[in-house]
Curated annotation (Swiss-Prot):
Protein species of origin: Shigella sonnei (strain Ss046)
Location within or outside the cell: Cell inner membrane
Keywords attached to this entry: Cell inner membrane, Cell membrane, Electron transport, Membrane, Translocase, Transmembrane, Transmembrane helix, Transport
Superkingdom, natural source: Bacteria
InterPro entries documented for this protein: Ion_transpt_RnfA/RsxA, NqrDE/RnfAE, NqrDE/RnfAE_oxidrdctase
Protein name, entry field: Ion-translocating oxidoreductase complex subunit A
Subunit relationships: The complex is composed of six subunits: RsxA, RsxB, RsxC, RsxD, RsxE and RsxG.
Biological process, per Gene Ontology: electron transport chain
Organism lineage string: Bacteria, Pseudomonadati, Pseudomonadota, Gammaproteobacteria, Enterobacterales
Keyword Electron transport: yes
Amino acid sequence: MTDYLLLFVGTVLVNNFVLVKFLGLCPFMGVSKKLETAMGMGLATTFVMTLASICAWLIDTWILIPLNLIYLRTLAFILVIAVVVQFTEMVVRKTSPVLYRLLGIFLPLITTNCAVLGVALLNINLGHNFLQSALYGFSAAVGFSLVMVLFAAIRERLAVADVPAPFRGNAIALITAGLMSLAFMGFNGLVKL
C-alpha cells in the first residue's frame, strides 16, 4: 500500500508531467487563461489519461506482447487514445454542453496531447502492473490538472495586474510557468523513486 501512495505522491508532485517531464505543454498554455476552462480540461484529461493508460496496458499485455507485435505499440496506443477521446467528447457533449462549448477545439486535441501518449508509453517502460498503470495514469492526470488549475488562477490574477508592457501575454505566462516549476522542485526530496 505504501508503494502505491509513493507512486501517487511522486507522480503528482515530484515527477509532474508538465513541470518536470514537459509533457502536455500545449493545453497547459492554451487552455489556462480561464479557471473554469482549465478545470474542465483537467477533468476531461484526467478521465482520458486514466482510461487510456488502463486500455493501453491491457492491449499491450493481452494482444501486442503475446502476438509479438511490440513494434506496433505507439500506433496501437494512439488509436486507443483516439477512441477514448471520442468517448469522452460524447459524454461531455451530453452531460455539459456549456463545458463542451468552452473547451471547443481543445477537447478533440486531447488526442494529440503528448502527456496522454507519454503516460501510456511510460507505464510499459517502467514495467507497471495493472493497478500501478491505472494509478500512474490517474496520478499523472491529477498532477497535470493541479498544475493547470494553479496556473489558470495565477493567469487570471495577472490579467488584471499592472504588468510592464514587454512582459504582457505569453512572456509573463512563461515566466510564471518557470517559477511554478522551481516551486515544484522543492518536492524533489519528498519521495525517492
